Amino acid sequence: MEFYQREGTTDQKVIEEVVKRNVYEHKKTGFLLKNSPVWLDLGGNIGTFACKASAAGCKVISYEPEPENYDYLSRNIERNQSNATPIKAGVVAGETGTLDLYVCKGDYNKYRHTIFKKRGRAAITIEVHNFKEVLEKYKPNGIKLDIEGAEIDILDSMEPDDWPECVNQVTFEYSFDIDPSIARFKRIVDKLGAHFDIVHHRKIDWAKEKYEYWPAAVMVYAKKTD
């Protein structure tokens, strides 16, 4: 795979993490991209996940709301002849409509744009789609979320019976810098555990009130075994 990228930016870090280090698979638990024929990619960025999953034989629907990232996403899908569809929008727990996206300052950071207000950041208006409506429309088997905190409300809104039977794998980076509450994280993974057979993440001290470690993010892998 080859990628159009912006030199001297987080693009190189993303390529290293997703393509080379393969952070969205967890082989010890059998969490593999190929196990889900259709992936919903939330936080498409420049297309590393979309192209990686396509190379594993999967179809991908990739959401990316930030215009420049979306342009790179589209170009990289085309460059790698990936079986992926880019969509210029975000996905949220709330209603379909529009929201402000607070974009990163400077020339380096291209992947920390967020719907949560950040001091000193400019905002752009983006289209957003409701998560449950997106699930109903595309009926994915796998879901990947890396959306800078928006995953928390989405996952917290999902009761065990809300997950469609077609979904057999979910992976996400949980953003403790947006909400450091360990109790909320536990509630979310417990609800996932009531639907999925395996929920894997690094060890957490459940007795603590807040997550105060660096990096302030934890990878989670949830999967069905049958």
Regions of interest found by a model, annotated:
Residues 1-226:
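Phosphate/nucleotide-binding beta-alpha loop and adjacent structural elements of enzyme active sites
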